[in-house]
Amino acid sequence: MIIMGIDPGFAIAGYGIVKYEGNKFTSVDYGAITTESSMELPKRLLVLYNGLKEIIEKYRPEAIAVEELFFNKNIKTALAVGHGRGVAVLAAAQSGIDVFEYTPIQVKQSIVGYGRAEKTQVQQMVKAILNLPAIPKPDDVADALAVAVCHAHSYKMISYGL
């Protein structure tokens, strides 16, 4: 199964393509789509959309996993990131790919075994699970890979009827 993980944003959106077969994970590709802060929001969203569509068309994932947004203070940031999330979901929907959403706590629980794990713990586990030479940077990329691995774990449980 090929899974695309997305850590949504409009300045930086991380993505990770993971292959999951027989309890084995392989990193296929990962990176970030970035936009210039000098660009107007609609143009930034278009850059994000075009970048995601290109990646989706190249790898044709069977599922797309997106980290749900969680902001408790800065509503302006939440709204801006929400635009990026909407673009990611739209790109997936237009490609006919099912979208699965996971909270940060679910991702941490799946990757580390503890829902309140530190970001560095998640990054180290992503590196180990995918046998990567280094922790992917920026952080958004490691987060995208983590949500893809989280979906593989969840999909496995769903397929077993758990």
UniProtKB/Swiss-Prot annotation:
GO terms for biological process: DNA recombination; DNA repair. GO terms for molecular function: crossover junction DNA endonuclease activity; DNA binding; magnesium ion binding. The active site is at residues 7, 67, 140. It comes from the Bacteria. It is found in: Cytoplasm. PROSITE patterns: RUVC. Pfam families: RuvC (PF02075). Its EC number is 3.1.21.10. Signal peptide: none annotated. It catalyses: Endonucleolytic cleavage at a junction such as a reciprocal single-stranded crossover between two homologous DNA duplexes (Holliday junction). InterPro entries: RNaseH-like_sf, RNaseH_sf, X-over_junc_endoDNase_Mg_BS, X-over_junc_endoDNase_RuvC. The keyword Secreted does not apply. Its cofactor is Mg(2+). Mg(2+) 1 binds at residues 7, 140. GO terms for cellular component: cytoplasm; Holliday junction resolvase complex. Mg(2+) 2 binds at residue 67. Keywords: Cytoplasm, DNA damage, DNA recombination, DNA repair, DNA-binding, Endonuclease, Hydrolase, Magnesium, Metal-binding, Nuclease. Binds 2 Mg(2+) ion per subunit. The keyword Transport does not apply. Belongs to the RuvC family. Homodimer which binds Holliday junction (HJ) DNA. The HJ becomes 2-fold symmetrical on binding to RuvC with unstacked arms; it has a different conformation from HJ DNA in complex with RuvA. In the full resolvosome a probable DNA-RuvA(4)-RuvB(12)-RuvC(2) complex forms which resolves the HJ. The RuvA-RuvB-RuvC complex processes Holliday junction (HJ) DNA during genetic recombination and DNA repair. Endonuclease that resolves HJ intermediates. Cleaves cruciform DNA by making single-stranded nicks across the HJ at symmetrical positions within the homologous arms, yielding a 5'-phosphate and a 3'-hydroxyl group; requires a central core of homology in the junction. The consensus cleavage sequence is 5'-(A/T)TT(C/G)-3'. Cleavage occurs on the 3'-side of the TT dinucleotide at the point of strand exchange. This is Crossover junction endodeoxyribonuclease RuvC. It comes from Acetivibrio thermocellus (strain ATCC 27405 / DSM 1237 / JCM 9322 / NBRC 103400 / NCIMB 10682 / NRRL B-4536 / VPI 7372).
